[in-house]
Amino acid sequence: HINAQIMQLHHSEHHAAYVNNLNVVEEKYQEALKKGDVTAQVALQPALKFNGGGHINHSIFWTNLSPNGGGEPKGELLEAIKRDFGSFEKFKEKLTAVSVGVQGSGWGWLGFNKEQGRLQIAACSNQDPLQGTTGLVPLLGIDV
């Protein structure tokens, strides 16, 4: 269970800041493109990655939440977890270990590897988006 105050902070302050900052950076980037200012375009890349990633990651995070969530998944997802991790319990242990192993800010992820047709656990630093960083399709994100 995550309390309402934490969720309100995450939505109204953290996620909102990523969106607002991304909008500002995108405007500056468009100006740099129009001017042909490659130096400015390159200089804006870290802010695009951080704020764009923060927006992407938190948008995924909100879709993962449910007022009656928790417990084991059902159907194809549970079968894929058992196939790729041995059991739901082993999956939780591995995802927890990877997530708590993130130093500083970051994310623990369950993703789908399209090339291998299997689930994978990964971590990303800061607000680096999973798909843009690893190529995995994000299924579940844990903000650490």
From Swiss-Prot:
<dbReference type="GO" id="GO:0005759">
    <property type="term" value="C:mitochondrial matrix"/>
</dbReference>
<feature type="modified residue" description="N6-succinyllysine; alternate">
    <location>
        <position position="35"/>
    </location>
</feature>
<dbReference type="Pfam" id="PF02777">
    <property type="entry name" value="Sod_Fe_C"/>
</dbReference>
<feature type="modified residue" description="N6-succinyllysine; alternate">
    <location>
        <position position="28"/>
    </location>
</feature>
<dbReference type="InterPro" id="IPR050265">
    <property type="entry name" value="Fe/Mn_Superoxide_Dismutase"/>
</dbReference>
<keyword id="KW-0560">Oxidoreductase</keyword>
<keyword id="KW-0832">Ubl conjugation</keyword>
<comment type="subunit">
    <text>Homotetramer.</text>
</comment>
<keyword id="KW-0496">Mitochondrion</keyword>
<feature type="modified residue" description="3'-nitrotyrosine">
    <location>
        <position position="18"/>
    </location>
</feature>
<dbReference type="GO" id="GO:0004784">
    <property type="term" value="F:superoxide dismutase activity"/>
</dbReference>
<feature type="binding site">
    <location>
        <position position="10"/>
    </location>
    <ligand>
        <name>Mn(2+)</name>
    </ligand>
</feature>
<protein>
    <recommendedName>
        <fullName>Superoxide dismutase [Mn], mitochondrial</fullName>
        <ecNumber>1.15.1.1</ecNumber>
    </recommendedName>
</protein>
<dbReference type="InterPro" id="IPR036314">
    <property type="entry name" value="SOD_C_sf"/>
</dbReference>
<dbReference type="InterPro" id="IPR019832">
    <property type="entry name" value="Mn/Fe_SOD_C"/>
</dbReference>
<feature type="binding site">
    <location>
        <position position="58"/>
    </location>
    <ligand>
        <name>Mn(2+)</name>
    </ligand>
</feature>
<feature type="modified residue" description="N6-acetyllysine; alternate">
    <location>
        <position position="28"/>
    </location>
</feature>
<feature type="binding site">
    <location>
        <position position="143"/>
    </location>
    <ligand>
        <name>Mn(2+)</name>
    </ligand>
</feature>
<dbReference type="InterPro" id="IPR019831">
    <property type="entry name" value="Mn/Fe_SOD_N"/>
</dbReference>
<feature type="modified residue" description="N6-acetyllysine; alternate">
    <location>
        <position position="82"/>
    </location>
</feature>
<keyword id="KW-0944">Nitration</keyword>
<feature type="modified residue" description="N6-acetyllysine">
    <location>
        <position position="74"/>
    </location>
</feature>
<feature type="modified residue" description="N6-succinyllysine; alternate">
    <location>
        <position position="82"/>
    </location>
</feature>
<keyword id="KW-0479">Metal-binding</keyword>
<dbReference type="InterPro" id="IPR001189">
    <property type="entry name" value="Mn/Fe_SOD"/>
</dbReference>
<dbReference type="Pfam" id="PF00081">
    <property type="entry name" value="Sod_Fe_N"/>
</dbReference>
<dbReference type="GO" id="GO:0030145">
    <property type="term" value="F:manganese ion binding"/>
</dbReference>
<feature type="modified residue" description="N6-acetyllysine; alternate">
    <location>
        <position position="35"/>
    </location>
</feature>
<keyword id="KW-0464">Manganese</keyword>
<feature type="modified residue" description="N6-acetyllysine; alternate">
    <location>
        <position position="90"/>
    </location>
</feature>
<dbReference type="InterPro" id="IPR036324">
    <property type="entry name" value="Mn/Fe_SOD_N_sf"/>
</dbReference>
<comment type="function">
    <text>Destroys superoxide anion radicals which are normally produced within the cells and which are toxic to biological systems.</text>
</comment>
<dbReference type="GO" id="GO:0005739">
    <property type="term" value="C:mitochondrion"/>
</dbReference>
<feature type="modified residue" description="N6-succinyllysine; alternate">
    <location>
        <position position="90"/>
    </location>
</feature>
<keyword id="KW-0007">Acetylation</keyword>
<comment type="similarity">
    <text>Belongs to the iron/manganese superoxide dismutase family.</text>
</comment>
